């Protein structure tokens, strides 16, 4: 009987360790998901917002350009903002992940 108690007590600790390890992995996954979602939204919406801000508020009001030139300049601004957003994502993916190192598990 004493062997059964020892085995079940050890199994309880193992289950608790597995549960805390699973919670740790879940929180890491959620954190990674939030980061990727943020950069996806930045990559999708920043160029669109940049295009319309440049077109509607900056170029039309302050410069006397033709509509075609305003559209071209706004498109160039949107492409530049897209490249900045992609560069930020690549920088974060390459240099920002130093705190999360892979841990070998059995």
Swiss-Prot record:
Cited Pfam families: VMA21 (PF09446)
Keywords (A to Z) from UniProt: Cytoplasmic vesicle, Endoplasmic reticulum, Membrane, Transmembrane, Transmembrane helix
GO biological process entries: vacuolar proton-transporting V-type ATPase complex assembly
Cellular compartments annotated: Endoplasmic reticulum membrane; Endoplasmic reticulum-Golgi intermediate compartment membrane; Cytoplasmic vesicle, COPII-coated vesicle membrane
One annotated Gene Ontology cellular component of this protein: ER to Golgi transport vesicle membrane
Domain of life (superkingdom): Eukaryota
Membrane spanning residue stretches: 33-53, 70-90
All ranges on the Lumenal side of the membrane: 54-69
Recorded topology in the membrane: Multi-pass membrane protein
Region annotation Disordered: where it falls in the sequence: 1-26
InterPro entries: Vma21 (IPR019013)
Residue numbers on the Cytoplasmic membrane side: 1-32, 91-106
Family, as annotated: Belongs to the VMA21 family.
UniProt function note: Required for the assembly of the V0 complex of the vacuolar ATPase (V-ATPase) in the endoplasmic reticulum.
Listed name of the protein: Vacuolar ATPase assembly integral membrane protein VMA21 homolog
Source species: Drosophila ananassae (Fruit fly)
Phylogenetic lineage: Eukaryota, Metazoa, Ecdysozoa, Arthropoda, Hexapoda
């Amino acid at each position: 009987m004493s062997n059964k108690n020892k085995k079940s007590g050890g199994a309880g600790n193992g289950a608790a360790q597995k549960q805390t390890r699973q919670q740790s992995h879940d929180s890491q996954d959620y954190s990674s998901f939030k980061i990727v979602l943020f950069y996806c939204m930045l990559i999708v919406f920043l160029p669109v917002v940049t295009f319309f801000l440049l077109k509607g508020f900056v170029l039309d009001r302050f410069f006397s350009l033709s509509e075609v030139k305003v559209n071209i300049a706004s498109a160039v601004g949107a492409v530049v903002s897209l490249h900045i957003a992609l560069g930020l994502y690549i920088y974060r993916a390459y240099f920002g992940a130093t705190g999360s190192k892979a841990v070998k598990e059995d």
